[in-house]
Amino acid sequence: MYAYGPVPSRRLGRSLGVSPIPPKTCSYNCIYCQLGQTGRVQVRRESFYPKEDILSDIGKAVKVINSANIDYITFVGDGEPTLCKDLGWLIGKCKQQWQIPVAVITNGSLLFMKDVRQDLESSDVVLPTLDAGSEDVFRTLNRPHGSIGFEEMLQGQVDFRKEYSGKIWLEVMLVKDVNDSDKSLMEINDAIKQVKPDRIYISVPIRPPAKPGVRPPEPGRIIRAHEIFGTILDLTDYESGEFGFDNYPDARTAITEICSRHPLREEQARDIELRFSESGNIDSMLSDGSLVRVEYQNMPYLLPAKFIGILSK
């Protein structure tokens, strides 16, 4: 299943997610990633799956869910979606077939490639990440593919801003003692000024991260980021809203599919059971080992068992 949700998004409302790449295929190996360590760190773009199959799956989801209940079709992936070299074709087909805005959530690392920038030009909103303002923080926090340097990544985002007529909503992930000092925040702000996004979002780790010990900054550091960055939108709390379930036959499938791409708080998973008027799925999945309960910031999360190995590396 390439299309999933809709999931409640703090930025995009009811977002129908589309993953055109294999799990954990990315150009980064971020220490805060909720999907664990990157299995394939690469910059080579590929056709990972038949593009017609991906489009067909999106069409089935839109038909079942009803386009009126979808705010965005969002290419997000279980890694970096711009690694899919069919992304431009898929965006174009979505725009032709459905009157639903298209968003792309990207780490922004491949925007130095002209073909990537061209693939994104027909989307409505692009949401890149910019977590660092220097090479050393970039290497520590995002752990990019060896061929990607900070200046190259930043210049790609600057060039994209010059060429792109849609909206750019930039996200900055702040991690305690990594990029939340005054020096780091001011360096990030200098980079933001070059990109000139339409919106700036601050976020912090709220789900179990790839690297043990990753924590959100102290509240005072988040306030300081607000002071330095100026007008920003805050994503430092949990998302609200309901997941969409019309695309799933039962609670177990819904929990498995959503959890694989969007780790669930246990209360969210229990709510999914209630929506299907089912019970016992979660306890059964915990017993048979297909799900694992993980505590992060005093909040219980349910993750697929396959995550545990890559979260503990």
Question: Where does each model-flagged region fall?
Answer:
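Canonical Radical SAM [4Fe-4S] cluster-binding loop centered on the CxxxCxxC motif
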Residues: R10-D53
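Short, basic/glycine-rich phosphate-binding loops at helix/coil junctions
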Residues: Q34-T38, N69-Y72, G133-V137, I168-W169
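Auxiliary Fe-S-binding modules of radical SAM enzymes
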Residues: M1-R11, N66, D180-K313
